[in-house]
Every structure is written in structure tokens, then in C-alpha cells.
């Protein structure tokens, strides 16, 4: 039997998933959270999908072994490439999985007026077709325009400065989306909410942006409540952080993403069995 006092576990390739945790701390402040940033493998966006699936299975195993009542894939590439393997591991522990793709697709399909939805994501996410399938499953004959933006997540993860070069890069990625006349854009990478103001300026005020954080926090709340695992009461929850790469660089960027003090970040190392 899973105990409601256990934490919600989430992972991402880096710090992007903290945009999801940020929304969870607002919507569900009484819950405990464990967050793992797999920074030694960042970025996931260009990696071999077979290698990624093995990695995701291992991360799911490690997090659930520690004890968790829910597993959140706070990474679009990991969801697109490895949701199935994460679910297989979680099933052995009797734990449910909340991914990041489907909740966003549902919101985008519900709010579009002209049926033209853009997706800005990593190369792996676009090539997986995960968003296209999730949007087609909404059954509304939507027109989906996907654009791979491979340089954007590394740029954000490194904490680079926003300058003219960045704007030019973003304009290049947004050009086909503008041309297609989308009215809704899915930010298909949990790093991208940090550049939402820039994207909004380029696309214009009539394009609605759908980020993962809000959609996933709502899905987590629904899942916990329906399974009777939501934490009762008003106590302030705890959060702890693990990084597979250097903790100092993780801490600096992560504090900016979360807008909260991180406390100690612990480094974990594990290798995928060949």
C-alpha cells in the first residue's frame, strides 16, 4: 500500500523541470517533493533514443526505490522517448506516472480557435511524434506545426544572457510558426517558459502559449486526489534536490528557475548497465 506521506518524485534532463516544480509548489504546497536533474546527460534533445530509454528506466528505478507515491516526468524529451519504460518500472512499485505531453495537448486543443497549433521542442521530441499523436487523439482535426529548436534548451540551461543573438535565434525558430498562422503554441520543453516573454513578443499577443508546469501541476493534483494520496492539512511540504552533474552549476541556475532557496543539492552518480 502506498502511503500518502511519501513524496512526489520528479526528474528532468536538467533544471527545466523546475518550471513544473515551481507550479507544484504554488498549487500543492503541502506535498513533499524529490527532484532529480540528470545534468551529466544534458541535453536529452539530441541523444540516442535507445540510450535515453535505458537511462530513464534507471532513474525511475532509483527514485521509486527511495520511496515515492507518484512519478512525474518533468521533461518533454523524456516523456516523448521514455514514457512507456517509466510506466513499466512504476507499475512494479504500484505507482502512477504523470507525463508532461498529454496534459499540454489537452489544454492546447481546448483553447485553440483556428485549430492551428504550434509545437516548439527538442529534435528528439519532434521526431518522436509524441505531440502530434497526443493532439490527434483529441479528435478535432487539428493542424499541427512542429519546429525543432535544438539550441534553445542548452542556451537556457547555461544561464546565458538574453542578447540580440538570442532574439535572432528565437525569431528563426518562430518564423515557420508565424507563417503557418498558429493561434496556440505548446512550449514543448520544460526549459522554454523562461523565454516565454521573448517568444510572446515575436509571435504577437494573439498567440496563446501553453507551458508544461501549469498543466502538469493540475494533472498531479487530479491523480493524487483520485487515488486518495493527496496530503491533508496545511503543513509546509519539503523538497530535496539531486543532480548527476556538478552541484554548484546546478544550484546557481536552479535557484533562478525555482525562485526559492534550494538548500543542499546532493550529487548522485549511477551508470547504466550495458
Which residues does each predicted region cover?
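Non-catalytic structural scaffold of enzyme domains
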Residues: 1-274
